[in-house]
Amino acid sequence: MKRVINSCIAVLLGVAVMSAVIVLCSENPSVSLAAFFLKPFSTRGYIRALFHKAGLFVCMALGASCALKTGMINLGGDGQIYAAGFVTALLLREYWGVGFLLQWSVALLCALSVAGILACVSGILKAWLATSEMITSFLLSTACVPLIDALIITVTRDPAGNLLATAPVHSHFILQQQTSLFGVPAVLTYASLVALAVGCFFSYTRVGYQFRICGKAPEFGRFVGFPVWATYVWGMVLSGALFGLTGFFSVVGLFGTCYVGFSVGMGYAALAHALIAHAHITVLVPLAFFFAWMETASEAAVLGAHLTVNVVLFLQAAIFLLISAQWSAPWNAVRRGARRVYRFLVTVFCFRGEKHRTRRRHALSVHDTHHRRSRWE
């Protein structure tokens, strides 16, 4: 319950901060607020883009949540998504003549492998040298981004004249026009199935149980004989592979190409998403629609209402600042104070005679028993 309260307060305050920024930075606040809150649902194209972004947010949040469940924090999401998208664009820009499904599967496997290897380096350094995975993953991501930028601009630039993107993906590999059950975009459907598989892995498999135990209590994991070092490595590999899946779906689903800097901010958005959900897989999918709505609404406000500030950044900042606050602490202090006042009143008014003393002891024992029971429940 405390986690739910903290998450709800962080989200509400983040939305309030974004609304305040829109009012302060816009020349016409009413038009900007209307564009922010209503325009994402105004047309079918906006709704379709919202569903596509929700699928990407599910994959991103799964990557961040898998790292959190194993006791790690993967800050290299931007670089891992970027590398996977770049590899996908290179492998799918032309048809090889071996079957579309086979080529699509090879590109997917390569994208997952590249991102998983980048994350695996941080896991190995954590397991063998006890280095911080946050620092190593962030540094590797920071090193990969300018390297891929240079490759896109020089070697793999679109020969048709686009200076900031690779050649577009072959039309047969694009998921943008593909739909699945009830008209839901294919990206969101595939991402939901992946979320279901990851949730079953952590909840109903022996290896997933070991991952969760070693992530929460590594000393206990070592005591019972679990390979904690393997948890670090494979947890980061799984996190990187899911970030790579995000890059793959970004190229074949939403963008159709790999352009310079398309993954900027995705890693931190995924971390904010996972922190709000407290790494609960079942919460990630519905929460993805909220984050997709926020990003779509911010773009609509910037384009339609001439807003010069990307307010999604303020949402992420508010979440990072507020998610760690213990908002239930004041309520617990009030409960403790009320309990002390109750004990004082019982002591004052039940002091005369053996009958009153017995009644006082009984009242205090019943109150303490109820408090202990409610505390454990």
From Swiss-Prot:
Keywords: Cell inner membrane, Cell membrane, Membrane, Transmembrane, Transmembrane helix, Transport. It is found in: Cell inner membrane. Its main location: membrane. It is a multi-pass membrane protein. One of its GO terms (molecular function) is transmembrane transporter activity. The chain crosses the membrane at residues 4-24, 49-69, 72-92, 98-118, 135-155, 182-202, 223-245, 249-268, 274-294, 303-323. GO terms for cellular component: plasma membrane. Belongs to the binding-protein-dependent transport system permease family. Probably part of the ABC transporter complex RfuABCD involved in riboflavin import. Probably responsible for the translocation of the substrate across the membrane. PANTHER family: ABC TRANSPORTER, PERMEASE PROTEIN, GUANOSINE ABC TRANSPORTER PERMEASE PROTEIN NUPP. The complex is probably composed of two ATP-binding proteins (RfuB), two transmembrane proteins (RfuC and RfuD) and a solute-binding protein (RfuA). This is Probable riboflavin import permease protein RfuC. It comes from Treponema pallidum (strain Nichols). The gene is rfuC.
